[in-house]
Amino acid sequence: MSASPVILIADDEPLLTELLEFRLGARGYQTVVAHDGREALAKLEEAEPQAVVLDMMMPVHDGLEVLRRIRASAVHAQTPVIMLTARRGEADVIGALELGADDYLVKPFLPEELLVRLARLLAGKKL
């Protein structure tokens, strides 16, 4: 088997990105971190991650704009995306799923739940 999966974490909260880097690293994932939407799109091209954990409310480009661009990309359109956000409104959840998010998790969240959802997506299983 090749190298461990690379996960792009796009969130503007440094403590959260550190937590996710630690938890994902402990499970054998490699991580790449972006703190705004523009950086997330650049890291997507550089790192070619196998999945993206994406905050909805970030500076420069918000998570929905990043998701739109991922789904419009010939290269990355099939990359699994989990939205991880404090926005819990029905319109937010439905809007993200309609744009192509594979999963949606509301903060505060259980890190173990995120890990299970991520593993299922990487294995090609939908919840």
What are these regions (language model features)?
Residues 109-119:
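C-terminal output helix
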Residues 56-57, 82-83, 87:
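The short loop immediately C-terminal to the conserved phospho-acceptor aspartate in CheY-like receiver
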Residues 42, 64-77:
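Short amphipathic alpha-helix used as the core "switch/output" element in two-component signaling
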Residues 33-51:
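Acidic, metal-coordinating helix/loop segments flanking the phosphotransfer/catalytic sites
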Residues 17, 58-60, 77, 89, ...:
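The feature encodes the CheY-like receiver
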